[in-house]
From Swiss-Prot:
One of its GO terms (cellular component) is nucleus. It is found in: Nucleus. Its main location: nucleus. Transcription factor involved in the symbiotic nodule signaling pathway in response to rhizobial stimulation. Functions as a transcriptional regulator required for root infection by symbiotic rhizobia, infection thread (IT) formation, and nodule development. May coordinate these processes. Functions downstream of the CCAMK-CYCLOPS complex. Probably not involved in arbuscular mycorrhizal (AM) symbiosis. The lineage of its organism: Eukaryota, Viridiplantae, Streptophyta, Embryophyta, Tracheophyta. Keywords: DNA-binding, Nodulation, Nucleus, Transcription, Transcription regulation. This is Ethylene-responsive transcription factor ERN1. GO terms for biological process: nodulation; regulation of DNA-templated transcription. Residues 1-15 have a biased composition (Polar residues). Residues 34-91 bind DNA. Belongs to the AP2/ERF transcription factor family. ERF subfamily. InterPro entries: AP2/ERF_dom (IPR001471), AP2/ERF_dom_sf (IPR036955), AP2/ERF_ERF_subfamily (IPR050913), DNA-bd_dom_sf (IPR016177). The gene is ERN1. Induction: Induced in nodules 7 days after rhizobial inoculation. It comes from Lotus japonicus (Lotus corniculatus var. japonicus).
Length: 269
């Protein structure tokens, strides 16, 4: 009875040992088939491919029957691209005359040519950018011409204004001066006309600035403004004197000898 119970246990241990041996064999085979830059297709053949991120290169090295052949192709391409210090699957000696070396050399030359063309395109763009400076110079010249035209129009307007001022009414004060000089010095006008003349500084008005024949437009415009100011003040003084004269006629007696004098308005006419 004891022997019958022990036999099933032995059979179970034997089955477990055979399963474990199978798993170990698979793991060993998978480890030996792993190479850098090599992968296996579903058909069973091996493919080698190399990538270089610094130079932006991805190169198909080909399809091989064994993983070792694909790994050696990868090692050769890696040494040509990155140098002898790169990571490889085997210790390899690169031959510069191999077809793979010529392929990699052509690929690198194409990459360099593309970079040079991109640099030439960039330089051309940089050279073409300053072209709008001509338009800016033309616009600046147009603005300067417009400013000159505006200045000329303003100066012509000032000249026209001065011509209009020349046609304005100018009172003649020659008779006023002659009548004032012909009046006797004994006459006293302190009875009511002193404050009137004090309000209108005619002496200051008559002192006009003496200018020569050659004057600029600014001084000419200023002299015209002063002349208009003088004319307005003189007309205001004449209105005030006439008003005082009429008031004195209504208040004072017309038989007084004072009113035998000529009208005061004739002094300033």
């Amino acid at each position: 009875m004891e022997i019958q119970f022990q036999q099933p246990n032995l059979q179970q241990h034997q089955k477990a040992g055979t399963k474990g041996g199978k798993f170990k064999g698979r793991n060993r085979n998978s480890n030996t088939n792993k190479f850098v830059g090599v992968r296996q297709r579903p058909s069973g053949r091996w493919v080698a491919e190399i990538k270089d991120t610094t130079q932006k290169i991805r190169m198909w090295l080909g399809t091989f029957e064994t993983a070792e052949e694909a790994a050696r192709a990868y090692d050769e391409a890696a040494c040509l691209l990155r140098g002898s210090n790169t990571r490889t699957n085997f210790i390899t000696h690169v031959s510069l005359d191999s077809p793979l070396a010529s392929r990699i050399r052509n690929l690198l030359n194409n990459k360099k040519g593309n970079k040079k063309q991109e640099g030439v395109v960039d330089v051309g763009v940089d050279v073409d950018v300053p072209a709008p400076s001509a338009s800016t110079t033309s616009t600046s010249s147009n603005t300067s011409n417009s400013d000159k035209n505006d200045h000329n129009s303003l100066s012509s307007g000032k000249v026209q204004n001065t011509m209009l001022f020349d046609d304005a009414y100018k009172p003649d004060l020659s008779n006023c001066k002659e009548d004032f000089q012909s009046c006797p010095p004994q006459s006293n006008f302190s009875w009511g006309f002193g404050p009137v003349f004090d309000r209108f500084p005619i002496a200051q008005i008559l002192d006009m600035p003496k200018t020569d024949g050659m004057i600029d437009a600014a001084s000419l415009e200023l002299s015209e403004f002063e002349r208009m100011k003088v004319e307005r003040q003189i007309s205001a003084s004449l209105y005030a004197i006439n008003g005082v004269h009429e008031y004195m006629e209504t208040v004072q007696d017309s038989n007084e000898t004072l009113w035998d004098l000529p009208p005061l308005c004739s002094l300033f006419c």
